C-alpha cells in the first residue's frame, strides 16, 4: 500500500508516512485493539527527483526564481508536460482506484522539528469519481503541478526567507493518498479526524501532562488543523471533556 516513484527524497510528510508504515507491525496496535482497523491508506509518493525532472524538462528554472505572481507560476506549471513514466503510473493508479484522493505537498523542509512549514504549501482533494479515466488523469496531473508550483508562491518564498534555508535548495515531493471515509448523502468524509499529542501543556484537574491530548472533529479535520472549534480530550480520561473558549 506504500509505493514511491523516482529517485531522491520522499520529503517531510512522505518520510513520516514511510516510517509509520514500516513500524506498524512492530507497534502491535492491531493486537491491542483487534476491533479497530489501523493502517496507512494506500499511498504513492512522487520523490523529489520527479519534481527536479519536471522543472528542468519544462524549462521552468528561470521563472520559479523570478518575481512572477502566483497566478503566472500556476499557469506556467499547468502548461508543463509530465514524463511518460509519470503518466503511466498515474494511469495505473487511477485504473485501480476510483476513491477520493488527497494530493499533498511533501517538501524537503516540511515537518521539520523546529520549522514545520505547516500550511505553507498546497494540498488538493480530488473526488476522483468521473466516469472518464482520462478526465481523472488530467485532474490528478493538474493537482500535482499546482503542488509543485506552490513551492515558489510568494507565501512560501517569504516563509523560507525568514529561516536559515534558501528557496533554491527547496525540493518538492508529492504524496498521493486515498482519503479515509465513507459516503454520507452527497458528501464524503470520515466520522472523525484529529491530531493527537503525547504531552498536554494545559492539564486540568487530575489529568497529567503525560496523559496526552487529542483534538478531534467531525469529518476531515480541517477545523482542527486551522485552530477552529473542536473537541479536546485526554485519551486517558475520555469522559472528562474540558473545553476552553478557543
Feature names for model-found ranges:
Residues 1-32, 80-246:
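Conserved mixed alpha/beta core segments that line enzyme active sites in large multi-domain catalysts
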Residues 1-66, 70-81:
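A conserved helix-loop-beta module that forms one wall/lid of the active-site cleft
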